[in-house]
């Protein structure tokens, strides 16, 4: 039973509506970006501020809790997918699927094709692992070693690695941010991923053209493979037994993506197959296989000496690896649930949409929101959740499918994040690859061209999914039900 307060709730003013969001921006911009404070308590403080506003508007404490609970309950299936992602990475690692991708990817290196190979192989590894940071910190570091050995352009190599890492991340069902964008927009994961290709695939092609042309005109002629690459490939070959069965877990996920099968069951089947590979082909014991699924793979499970460079490559995955992402999600969803009860987002969006007169300007408004959030908060998850929460109903009212929104937010926040020096992603990529963010920025073509293609498609209508009248009516009706429940 819903408990209400005696005071009749009222609609907030524009200033009251902006106050919680501005508070969150200031707290995250100052605390997280400037002083490196963890974002979770800052989001909790932002939620408290939003809660005080909601109380001032006439809502009760129980109504606030009810709104937060409903917001979390609605996203619980996607949160379960995030946990399944950690399970999949851990089992793919111990089963040999990811190591085999890395092994054969590194075997493809050719001097003149160094830059485009770095782009494409990092993309492949990132698709398979679902982590841009992981692929940049492993394969990316390996390619930087190749570039140093060949006396290549380190900024161009780093740009190729970053672009490839983020393409793979956005087009992988294992990616936390991709799952988060789909759940926030209430769009099927695979539908979101396929729709994202309208902007990421042209950006990848453009990146590949730039890297190929530059590679053939850069004077790279050495055919020597640096010792770093030899250590990785020989180390992996000594630890794992590679055969085509290692690809079966990948094929299962790809099949599920193409046929749009339920995400979690497909991931579980893929993980089970990877476990069988780990036991029957790789020779790991059952205890280590289960531990890898829960806590992630660790090189201590390999009972032989391996090169130190493989430690960073192999130590990853597990369901527990997703707990940090889940905590941020819960904090952000608490803020979103509290704010949704106040009606503040409706007030803000109403003012914002006075400037929107076409699909193109709607896309531009979304890009502006995404860039502002990532530029100020420096947090990818928050920069996904808040703009989608603000604009989803506006898209539906204009007959635009919410997957246009989830795609544009990823283009303007997630993919743009690593080319901003003050964000965690920008700092990580610069520190890991040894190249300043602003130096590799021009070469990370995919990261900044996404918003160009998003804007172009918005004004031309290409790749813009429209809702049928029936779909629009159903989604609007569901939105009214959700509002009534709040």
Where are these regions (language model features)?
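Core mid-bundle transmembrane helix pairs that form the ion/substrate translocation pathway
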Residues: 222-260, 268
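Short juxtamembrane and helix-loop transition motifs at transmembrane-helix boundaries
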Residues: 2-10, 76, 93-104, 120-124, ...
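Alpha-helical transmembrane segments of multi-pass membrane proteins, especially transporters
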Residues: 42-50, 70, 74, 78, ...
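Generic alpha-helical transmembrane segments of integral inner-membrane proteins
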Residues: 22-30, 48, 52, 79, ...
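Hydrophobic transmembrane alpha-helices of multi-pass solute/ion transporters
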Residues: 2-87, 93-113, 251-331, 486
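Juxtamembrane and boundary regions of transmembrane helices in multi-pass small-molecule transporters
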Residues: 33-35, 170-173, 181-234, 397, ...
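Hydrophobic transmembrane alpha-helices that form the pore/transport pathway of multi-pass ion
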Residues: 110-202, 369-411, 475
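Membrane-embedded alpha-helical segments and adjacent helix-loop junctions characteristic
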Residues: 58-148, 305-393
């Amino acid at each position: 039973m819903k408990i209400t307060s005696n005071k009749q709730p009222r609609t907030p003013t524009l200033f009251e509506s902006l106050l919680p969001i501005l508070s969150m921006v200031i707290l995250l911009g100052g605390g997280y970006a400037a002083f490196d404070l963890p974002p979770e308590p800052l989001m909790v403080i932002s939620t408290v501020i939003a809660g005080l506003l909601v109380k001032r508007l006439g809502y009760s404490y129980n109504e606030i809790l009810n709104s937060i609970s409903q917001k979390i309950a609605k996203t619980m299936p996607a949160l379960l997918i995030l946990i399944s992602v950690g399970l999949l990475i851990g089992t793919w690692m111990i089963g040999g699927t990811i190591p085999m991708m890395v092994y054969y990817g590194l075997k493809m290196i050719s001097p003149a094709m160094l830059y485009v190979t770095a782009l494409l192989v990092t993309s492949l590894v990132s698709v398979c692992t679902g982590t841009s940071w992981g692929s940049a910190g492993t394969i990316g570091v390996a390619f930087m070693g190749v570039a140093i050995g060949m006396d290549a352009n380190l900024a161009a190599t780093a740009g190729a690695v970053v672009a490839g890492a983020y393409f793979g991340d956005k087009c992988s069902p294992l990616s936390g941010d991709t799952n988060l964008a789909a759940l926030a927009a209430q769009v099927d994961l695979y539908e979101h991923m396929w729709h994202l290709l309208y902007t990421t695939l042209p950006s990848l092609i453009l990146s590949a053209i730039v890297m190929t042309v530059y590679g053939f005109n850069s004077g790279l002629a050495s055919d020597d493979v640096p010792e770093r690459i030899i250590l990785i490939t020989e180390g992996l070959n000594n630890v794992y037994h590679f055969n085509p069965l290692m690809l079966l877990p990948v094929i299962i996920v790809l099949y599920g993506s193409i046929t749009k099968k339920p995400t979690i069951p497909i991931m579980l089947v893929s993980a089970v197959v990877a476990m069988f590979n780990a036991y029957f082909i790789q020779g790991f014991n059952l205890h280590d296989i289960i531990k890898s699924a829960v806590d992630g793979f660790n090189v201590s499970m390999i009972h032989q000496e391996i090169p130190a460079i493989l430690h960073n490559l192999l130590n990853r995955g597990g369901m527990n690896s997703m707990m940090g992402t889940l905590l941020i999600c819960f904090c952000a969803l608490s803020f979103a649930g509290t704010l949704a009860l106040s009606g503040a987002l409706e007030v803000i969006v109403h003012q914002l949409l006075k400037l929107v007169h076409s699909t193109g300007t709607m896309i531009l408004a979304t890009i502006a929101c995404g860039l502002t959030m990532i530029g100020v908060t420096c947090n990818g998850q928050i920069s996904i959740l808040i703009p989608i929460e603000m604009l989803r109903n506006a898209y539906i009212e204009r007959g635009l499918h919410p997957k246009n929104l989830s795609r544009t937010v990823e283009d303007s926040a997630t993919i743009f994040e690593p080319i901003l020096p003050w964000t965690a992603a920008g700092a990580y990529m610069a520190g890991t690859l040894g190249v300043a963010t602003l130096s590799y920025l021009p070469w990370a073509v995919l990261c900044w061209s996404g918003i160009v293609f998003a804007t172009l498609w918005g004004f031309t209508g290409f790749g813009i999914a429209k809702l049928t009248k029936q779909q629009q009516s159903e989604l609007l009706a569901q939105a009214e039900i959700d509002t009534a429940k709040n």
